[in-house]
UniProtKB/Swiss-Prot annotation:
EC number: 5.4.2.10
UniProt gene name: glmM
Species name: Deinococcus radiodurans (strain ATCC 13939 / DSM 20539 / JCM 16871 / CCUG 27074 / LMG 4051 / NBRC 15346 / NCIMB 9279 / VKM B-1422 / R1)
Highest taxon in the source lineage: Bacteria
Keyword annotations from UniProtKB, A to Z: Isomerase, Magnesium, Metal-binding, Phosphoprotein
Cellular component per GO, a single term: cytosol
Active site per the UniProt annotation: 103 (phosphoserine intermediate)
Record-linked HAMAP family: GlmM_B
Annotated protein name in UniProt: Phosphoglucosamine mutase
Post-translational changes noted in the entry: Activated by phosphorylation.
GO biological process: carbohydrate metabolic process; peptidoglycan biosynthetic process; UDP-N-acetylglucosamine biosynthetic process
Family from the record: Belongs to the phosphohexose mutase family.
Length: 444
């Protein structure tokens, strides 16, 4: 596949104001995207939503200027979770949706992510076409006068998205729930949905100021939520990240409930035959699924790979420990608030609690060793390394697993070993890491 110049695995992301997220470049991106969308649909409209970062307004204005300069009509949705933009893209029949967000990153960062007409990921071919159009922007014939696009503010976006979420909410009457909204995109939507479902809700981090998104809060900083739940006698707590495409729970005792727990609970309640997760998913989940006659499909790390495998196999349920969980029969993209609601629906259907789930799914000990090498690509095919891995697998005897994977950004090999005996897995990881280090130092 042709290598991308600007788009990463999750759109374009950088420090706001630095290339490529400068107003001039984002305007060029908007013009390029507008040109591509107009080729497909001469009456194209694009919806734009954003999280609560202070740079969102600047980038939104630049993007809208570029899109309208090519004759595309822009519909502003305002502050809305990323999956809400996906929902409105398909609900309004837009040619595309755009989210201005950097998810769980600090406020200085921002990003631009596109959805296709159905609210799913923009195709690789379309992304490459947009990249080519950016580089050709100077040669495009100008659009003028009545042919320019319009800009409107859609004031019903939050209400419609909230109604969609509420349609999937169980009856939460009598439940005391604490929410951490990360000062992000879900700060209004999440408390409203859980209150409408009947829960007694205590919501924190619901006062965004443009700079406090994810700061010491949200799904990557859950210590405060755990304390609130323990000391406040809540049934459970739920934390979202800045753009609310993921969710993590804590049980009534403050224990972390992550994606592996949610996948087990949902697979049982929804009658799934198989679940898709990643190579980092704990083996305890695999064992529990096997006991229930279910299979676990593993992919590379990243929710996009989980998504691709679900589509390829015609499956519905998959996710990662981070709280990115996909229910493709309900939504084409990860949705933190929806994930929380569907998880609670599964819990109520099975008549269980998050406390019981935590106690049942006891994670296998896992150790990770990073080894610096000269050529990370050559390590996988090195005979000595392959022999060391084979020896490790024999020692684990089906009661554990070993995985070697290269870092995406550094010349590192990550050696992960998982098993029932913590001392044994540390010894195995050290032995394999030593071989990797020796072979890696030699350039393999």
């Amino acid at each position: 596949m042709t290598e991308r110049k600007y788009f990463g695995t999750d759109g374009v992301r950088a420090v706001a104001g630095e290339f490529p997220l400068t107003p001039a470049w984002v305007m060029a991106l908007g013009a390029a995207a507008g040109e591509v969308f107009k080729r497909r649909n001469p009456r194209a409209s694009v919806v734009i939503g954003k999280d609560t970062r202070q740079s969102g307004d600047m980038l939104e204005a630049a993007l809208a200027a570029g899109l309208t300069s090519r004759g595309v009509n822009v519909v502003h949705l305002g502050v809305l979770p990323t999956p809400g933009v996906s929902y409105l893209t398909r609900h309004l029949g837009a040619e595309a949706g755009v989210v201005i967000s950097a998810s769980h990153n600090p406020y200085e960062d921002n990003g631009i992510k596109f959805f296709g007409p159905g609210g799913g990921k923009l195709s690789d071919a379309t992304e490459l076409e947009i990249e080519a159009a950016i580089d050709e922007a100077a040669t495009l014939a100008p659009v003028t006068g009545v042919n320019l696009g319009s800009v409107t503010n859609y004031t019903e976006a939050e209400r419609l998205y909230t109604a969609f979420l509420s349609s999937h909410a169980p009856d939460l009457s009598g439940m005391r729930i604490a929410l951490d909204c990360a000062n992000g995109a879900a700060y209004r939507v999440a408390p409203k949905v859980f209150q409408q479902a009947g829960a007694d809700v205590f919501a924190v981090y619901t006062t965004p100021d443009g700079r406090n998104i994810n700061r010491g809060c949200g799904s990557t900083h859950m210590d405060h939520l755990r304390l609130i739940v323990r000391e406040g006698d809540y049934d459970l707590g739920i934390a979202f990240d800045g753009d609310a495409d993921r969710a993590l729970f804590v049980d009534s005792r403050g224990n972390m409930i992550h994606g592996d727990h949610m996948l087990l609970l949902s697979a049982r309640a929804r009658g799934e035959k198989a679940v898709v997760a990643t190579i980092m998913t704990n083996m305890a989940l695999e064992v529990k699924l096997q006991e229930a006659g279910l299979t676990l499909e593993r992919t590379a790390v990243g929710d996009r790979y989980v998504h691709e495998r679900l589509h390829a196999k015609g499956l519905n349920l998959g996710g990662e420990q981070s709280g990115h969980v996909l229910f493709l029969d309900v939504s084409p993209t990860g949705d933190g608030v929806l994930t929380a609601l569907l998880t609670l629906s599964s819990m109520k259907k099975l008549g269980t609690t998050l406390d019981a789930l935590y106690d049942e799914l006891v994670m296998f000990p896992q150790t990770l060793v990073n080894v610096r090498v000269k050529d990370k690509k050559a390590i996988a095919s090195d005979p000595a390394v392959q022999h060391a891995v084979a020896d490790a697998e024999k020692q684990l005897a089906g009661k554990g697993r070993i995985n070697l994977r290269p870092s995406g950004t550094e010349n590192l090999i990550r050696v992960m070993v998982e098993g029932q005996d913590e001392g044994e897995i540390h010894d195995i990881a050290a032995a394999v890491a030593k071989v990797v280090e020796e072979r890696g130092a030699a350039g393999a």
